[in-house]
């Protein structure tokens, strides 16, 4: 087997190393198409939609079966350049692609990662905004918004407030994309600060303290995810590397306690797509000079790889009926971790739960039938590149009339009336709101 891998590594193509410069749409497309052509066995390039001005929203998939999902292989994604003037993430993802494909069958760790994970990489969600930026600029400049002047990170449905704004083509493309894949883990790459921010970004109630937090039922996992990234970035982990910016202990923060925002993408991923997403602020300067790019790559390379590995935390498996047929649309959740929109199995009966080591009670609920409780322990040292596997075989037979095949949609309206008591979210007072404007303006 090792000898076969060696020969395959020798047969894989060699593409010239990607240079450290900003790649505009034409150059980015040329690079992505070259990778897809030269590494066709492990990559798949496709567009999930178009921007306002008709530019493709490219996604490169890296994996052993890049064109299709395979049972037991979790789906991971990185998205960058949501704000067109925040450019470091865009280039880092191009270099990550270059590193992954060139290391396959050469570096054992990267090979295992690609063989056990389906990795989706979108270097630019806002190509129109990027092309609108005239030159490097550390602060607010043209290009943050899309061509229609919408901030895409305020454009998604919001669970806490009625975010009744016109959904943009780029936003709608992401929303449709989330319906086509069972994404488990994600990160959204930004610039203008140096911190890993985790959900929620919005919240409910009203006490008016800036330092209040809005916590998810999976706050322990989210803090772990954010710290996993920040701790491997030598500058982010210090927490105070940007002048005139807030100090972030250990380089992480709850998004709401930094400043509340409505219609953010990471909350939408978690609530409506059952995908854990954090926001990575990668540079104090939004659009730094090109000569700084190698430094950013060196600072973030280990973090980018280690974060992908976290998709294998916890437990995964399938739910079957008594005949062995997979059951779709079954609620599979940890007892006492109630989500706004319940986590459900996909059409193949699969579920993925990101959990830290420990003992849990898993609640499996089939619509119209009884719930089934199972205790399990996730070991501290699990098998590399694989979550604990636990299938459920239920004593019932699936019938289309009794169990819906399609997942019911969660209401796209404020859900504060239905929020469980675990949420510590608070709305800031008017005075606190103005205190946060400086953060919002320069983010």
Curated annotation (Swiss-Prot):
Location in or out of the cell: Cell membrane
UniProt KW Hydrolase keyword: yes
Entry keyword set: Carboxypeptidase, Cell membrane, Disulfide bond, Glycoprotein, GPI-anchor, Hydrolase, Lipoprotein, Membrane, Metal-binding, Metalloprotease, Protease, Signal, Zinc
Source organism superkingdom: Eukaryota
Catalytic site: 281
Enzyme Commission identifier(s): 3.4.17.12
Catalytic activity: Cleavage of C-terminal arginine or lysine residues from polypeptides
Protein known as: Carboxypeptidase M
Species annotation: Mus musculus
Gene behind this protein: Cpm
């Amino acid at each position: 087997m090792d000898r076969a891998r060696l020969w395959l590594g020798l047969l894989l193509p060699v593409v010239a190393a990607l240079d450290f410069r900003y790649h505009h749409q034409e150059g980015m497309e040329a690079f992505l198409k070259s990778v897809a052509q030269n590494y066709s066995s492990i990559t798949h390039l496709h567009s999930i939609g178009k921007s306002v001005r008709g530019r493709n929203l490219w996604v490169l998939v890296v994996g052993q079966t890049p064109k299709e999902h395979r049972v037991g292989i979790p789906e991971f994604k990185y998205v960058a350049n949501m704000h067109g003037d925040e450019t470091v993430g865009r280039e880092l993802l191009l270099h990550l692609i270059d590193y992954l494909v060139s290391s396959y069958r050469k570096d054992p760790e990267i090979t295992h990662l690609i063989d056990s994970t389906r990795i989706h990489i979108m270097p630019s969600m806002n190509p129109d905004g990027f092309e609108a930026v005239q030159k490097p600029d550390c602060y607010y400049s043209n290009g943050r918004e899309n061509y229609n002047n919408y901030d895409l990170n305020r454009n998604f449905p919001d669970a806490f407030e009625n975010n009744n704004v016109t959904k943009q083509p780029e936003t709608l493309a992401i929303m449709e994309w989330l319906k086509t894949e069972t994404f488990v883990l994600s990160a959204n790459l930004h610039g203008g600060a140096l911190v890993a921010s985790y959900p929620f970004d919005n919240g409910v109630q009203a006490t008016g303290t800036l330092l209040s937090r809005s916590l998810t039922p999976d706050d322990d996992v989210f803090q772990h995810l954010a710290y996993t990234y920040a701790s491997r970035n030598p500058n982010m982990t210090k927490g105070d590397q940007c002048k005139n910016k807030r100090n972030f202990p250990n380089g992480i923060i709850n998004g709401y306690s930094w400043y509340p925002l409505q219609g953010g993408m990471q909350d939408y991923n978690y609530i409506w797509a059952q995908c854990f997403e954090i926001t990575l602020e990668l540079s104090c300067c939004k659009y730094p000079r090109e000569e700084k790019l190698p430094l950013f790559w060196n600072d973030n390379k280990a973090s980018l790889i280690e974060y992908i590995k976290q998709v294998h935390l916890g437990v995964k498996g399938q739910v079957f009926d008594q005949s062995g047929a997979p059951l779709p649309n079954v609620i599979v959740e940890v007892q006492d971790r109630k989500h706004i929109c319940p986590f459900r199995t996909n059409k193949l009966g699969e579920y993925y739960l990101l959990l830290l080591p420990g003992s849990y009670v898993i609640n499996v609920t089939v619509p119209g039938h009884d719930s089934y409780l199972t205790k399990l322990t996730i070991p501290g040292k699990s098998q590399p590149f694989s979550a604990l596997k636990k299938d459920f075989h239920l004593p019932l037979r699936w019938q289309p009339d009794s169990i819906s095949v399609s997942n019911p949609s969660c209401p796209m309206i404020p859900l504060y009336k239905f929020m469980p008591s675990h949420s510590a979210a608070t709305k800031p007072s008017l005075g606190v709101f103005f205190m946060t404007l400086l953060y919002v303006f320069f983010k």
